[in-house]
């Protein structure tokens, strides 16, 4: 499986942005992905060294539209901690157009 198939998208919330100061990056990953697969994918895509990987499963929430109920999709989040000597991961472009 390709590394870009495992890492779906970065999670951009206030909490995850604060964790970036401690070299912890949060990603939505494939529901069937393991810690080892996430570690190898992050190291391959971003060219960094991973110290630790924590994974959590997020259940889908029930949503209603009128009288019809449904559920949002379940997902899996991975918090990846980088080593101290690793470079930071650039999630956002720093290009500013004037």
UniProtKB/Swiss-Prot annotation:
It comes from Lactobacillus gasseri (strain ATCC 33323 / DSM 20243 / BCRC 14619 / CIP 102991 / JCM 1131 / KCTC 3163 / NCIMB 11718 / NCTC 13722 / AM63). The gene is rplW. One of its GO terms (cellular component) is ribonucleoprotein complex. This is Large ribosomal subunit protein uL23. Belongs to the universal ribosomal protein uL23 family. One of the early assembly proteins it binds 23S rRNA. One of the proteins that surrounds the polypeptide exit tunnel on the outside of the ribosome. Forms the main docking site for trigger factor binding to the ribosome. NCBIfam families: PRK05738.2-4. InterPro entries: Nucleotide-bd_a/b_plait_sf (IPR012677), Ribosomal_uL23-like (IPR013025), Ribosomal_uL23/eL15/eS24_sf (IPR012678), Ribosomal_uL23_CS (IPR001014). Keywords: Ribonucleoprotein, Ribosomal protein, RNA-binding, rRNA-binding. GO terms for molecular function: rRNA binding; structural constituent of ribosome. Part of the 50S ribosomal subunit. Contacts protein L29, and trigger factor when it is bound to the ribosome. Pfam families: Ribosomal_L23.
């Amino acid at each position: 499986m390709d590394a870009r198939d495992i890492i779906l998208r970065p999670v951009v919330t206030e909490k995850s942005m604060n964790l970036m100061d401690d070299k912890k990056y949060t990603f939505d990953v494939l529901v069937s992905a393991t810690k080892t697969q996430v570690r190898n994918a992050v190291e391959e895509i971003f060219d960094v060294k991973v110290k630790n990987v924590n994974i959590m499963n997020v259940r889908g929430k029930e949503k209603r539209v009128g009288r019809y109920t449904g559920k949002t999709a379940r997902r899996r989040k991975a918090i990846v901690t980088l080593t101290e000597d690793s470079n930071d991961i650039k999630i956002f472009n720093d290009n500013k157009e004037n």
